[in-house]
Amino acid sequence: MSENVIKETENKKNSRGRNWTFVLYPESAKAEWLEYLKELHIQFVVSPLHDRDTDTEGRMKKEHYHILVMYEGNKSYEQIKIITEELNATIPQIAGSVKGLVRYMLHMDDPNKFKYQKEDMIVYGGVDVDELLKKTTTDRYKLIKEMIEFIDEQGIVEFKSLMDYAMKFKFDDWFPLLCDNSAYVIQEYIKSNRYKSDR
């Protein structure tokens, strides 16, 4: 074993962090893995079952879950490894970014990968996954553009019509934007459309 490999292994064993991640394969996982995690009384997020992932050759990967465990204080690699061994999961790694990892669980930022659904995540211990998945500024602008195009295509002249549509058909993207921070610009756009059609 080379000196570099030994150093890397030692560094991993000596690492400490609050947020850790690992992969769990259902075919080899402990039967009661979810109950085991719940009994730890920690915050965690389990991805939807990744059953549509492909490798670079286009072959299907083995079904798996990405799991993020979160602690209030630092935990060592050895402490987390006890958990992954109990679950029969992969070796743990420190999560570089909680937000980035949760977005990756759904493949939100990779247009070439299958998109998994937020509703299929398992969230435990009060994790605010909606906050972690909050739209970026670029995402918001794209959705506002979508709404404006929809307003023009449908000839919408009342804000209520758009809100009703968003509530029924675009609850996960348009509706939160309209409720939280984009209503003013959209209302002004609809109002100007109405004045234009009245002339």
UniProtKB/Swiss-Prot annotation:
Q: Name one GO molecular function term.
A: DNA binding
What biological-process terms (Gene Ontology) are attached? DNA replication
Q: The organism sits in which domain of life?
A: Bacteria
Q: Name one GO cellular component term.
A: extrachromosomal circular DNA
Give one Pfam family.
Rep_OBD
Alphabetical UniProt keywords = DNA replication, Plasmid
Described by its record, this protein's role is as follows: Is essential for plasmid replication. Nicks the positive strand at the plus origin of replication.
Entry's family note = Belongs to the Gram-positive plasmids replication protein type 2 family.
Its recorded name reads: Replication protein
Recorded source organism is: Staphylococcus aureus
